């Protein structure tokens, strides 16, 4: 494994990401019509070259040939409407890849009209609606995109039944769009419906069901992370309801991961290395849950045990499992952290190549909690600052051998008092993977963080104390560098 991949594995288990954007469940080029034939050899060659160039991601060239093919087919009255519709659809897909949504929509609408002349329930309606929906999503026309996705789903129901496997792509898109629109309950419903489809197609205990269970587990983890853990009214007008919703959502995530584990254990046994990805995802979920962090230790201890006893696992993978466990111990205040880090240190001291990797991991401190920086929105510009002047705080601090922060000093800044308190609290509660030199944990001094703030209102406040942090916006930049 490369150093970057290993370091990525180390941090991934501790980070519960939050995504509020629509992620594409498929590439529009997946819906290209690839089996067309024409009486003209010129058109056959244009068609084949269009597909080949699209597959090679050469969309400019594919677009030129596609335009020529559209013109040729449109001028040939011997070609049936359905074939022309498919040629138009291919051209629309290429236009979409060229970031020409207006032209793509015009082409796809012409294609739909031709197909509807055959039947409004024709099978081709499904790919056309999927392509149109993805174009609309990129345009931000999300409500209309859902309408197209629903129509695509309806077509699959007519030909494959309510649990048609073909619809999973459409359902994924519907769920993602609803997440972006903050229709979370509807997004939840769509995610669970996709699980039912997979259960119906694959079987409730099929090993092939594991990827879907893991995907839904990750979805509900992301949902849970998006809700505040704190009960303070600053974050919510209904804190008790939010806490219950958060707990319920994390319970769903954990339940799906546990089910995936049970299926894998039945298929492979309890100590198979193929369980590791699911175990790490479950540990990440427990860490994000916060109230379940102690359980994450047990899960990652199991990962270490599986890897250490498996002859297939290599030394870097074993070291990664120990570092992930050590980081979890550090966050939880478990005294076993130091011993665990040193085991990883020793493993990575066996060859010069491993030693270089060891130094990249342990030669400097690494923030492991909180992974989300402090809020950086203030209500008004402080009265002592000018319009356009940067509002900031610069602080220095040290990281102790146990990964805790000490010697916090706000050395410079013009931000309000509330923000200074926030930065101090953020640093005080931070946990770091400590620096190790010659197998000894050492104090790291002279670290600096620089935090900027954005202003909601342009008018200056009468006093700098009147501002308050926003619970939703993250900082532009937080740098932590060691002084020379």
Give each language-model segment a name.
Residues 69, 73, 111, 115, ...:
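Hydrophobic packing position at a conserved site in alpha-helical tandem repeat units
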Residues 1-8:
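Bacterial N-terminal signal peptides that target proteins for export
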Residues 8-17:
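Bacterial N-terminal signal peptides
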Residues 20-24:
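Sec/Tat signal peptide C-region and signal peptidase I cleavage site
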Residues 74, 80-116:
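Mid-chain, structured segments of secreted extracytoplasmic proteins
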Residues 101-143, 150, 156-157, 172:
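Surface-exposed, polar helix/loop patches in the mature regions of secreted/periplasmic/lumenal proteins
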Residues 25-48, 59, 63, 67, ...:
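Charge-biased low-complexity segments
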């Amino acid at each position: 494994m490369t150093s970057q991949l290993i370091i990525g594995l180390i941090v991934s288990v501790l980070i519960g990401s939050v995504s509020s954007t629509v992620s594409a469940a498929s590439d529009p080029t997946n819906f290209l019509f690839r089996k067309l034939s024409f009486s003209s050899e010129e058109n056959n060659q244009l068609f084949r070259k269009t597909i080949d160039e699209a597959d090679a991601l050469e969309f400019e060239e594919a677009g030129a040939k596609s335009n020529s093919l559209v013109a040729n087919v449109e001028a040939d009255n011997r070609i049936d409407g359905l074939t022309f519709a498919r040629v138009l659809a291919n051209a629309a897909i290429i236009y979409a890849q060229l970031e020409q949504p207006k032209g793509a929509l015009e082409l796809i609408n012409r294609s739909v009209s031709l197909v509807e002349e055959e039947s409004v329930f024709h099978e081709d309606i499904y790919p056309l609606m999927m392509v149109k929906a993805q174009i609309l999503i990129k345009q931000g026309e999300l409500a209309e995109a859902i309408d197209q996705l629903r129509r695509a789903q309806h077509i699959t129901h007519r030909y494959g039944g309510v649990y048609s496997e073909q619809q999973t792509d459409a359902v994924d898109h519907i769920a993602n769009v609803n997440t972006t629109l903050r229709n979370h309950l509807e997004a939840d419903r769509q995610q669970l419906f996709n699980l039912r489809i997979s259960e119906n197609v694959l079987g409730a205990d099929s090993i092939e069901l594991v990827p879907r269970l893991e995907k839904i587990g990750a979805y509900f983890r992301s949902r849970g992370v998006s809700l505040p853990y704190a009960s303070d009214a600053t974050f919510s007008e209904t804190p008790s309801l939010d806490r219950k919703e958060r707990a319920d959502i994390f319970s769903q995530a954990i339940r799906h991961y546990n089910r995936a584990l049970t299926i894998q254990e039945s298929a492979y046994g309890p100590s198979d290395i193929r369980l590791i990805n699911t175990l790490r995802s479950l540990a990440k979920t427990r860490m994000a849950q916060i109230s379940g962090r102690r359980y994450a230790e047990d899960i990652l201890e199991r990962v270490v045990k599986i890897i250490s006893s498996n002859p297939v696992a290599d030394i870097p993978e074993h070291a990664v499992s120990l570092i992930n466990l050590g980081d979890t111990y550090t966050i939880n205040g478990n005294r076993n952290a130091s011993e665990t880090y040193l085991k990883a240190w020793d493993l990575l001291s066996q060859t010069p190549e491993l030693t270089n990797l060891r130094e990249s991991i342990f030669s400097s401190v690494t923030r492991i909690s909180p992974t989300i920086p402090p809020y950086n929105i203030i209500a008004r510009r402080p009265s002592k600052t000018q319009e356009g002047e940067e509002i900031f705080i610069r602080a220095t601090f040290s990281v102790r051998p146990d990964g805790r922060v000490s010697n916090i000093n706000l050395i410079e800044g013009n931000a309000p008092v509330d923000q200074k308190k926030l930065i101090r609290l953020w640093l005080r509660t931070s946990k770091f993977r400590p620096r190790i030199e010659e197998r000894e944990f050492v104090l790291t001094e002279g670290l600096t963080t620089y935090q900027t703030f954005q202003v909601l209102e342009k008018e200056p406040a009468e006093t700098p104390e009147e501002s308050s942090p926003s619970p939703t916006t993250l900082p532009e930049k937080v740098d932590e560098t060691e002084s020379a």
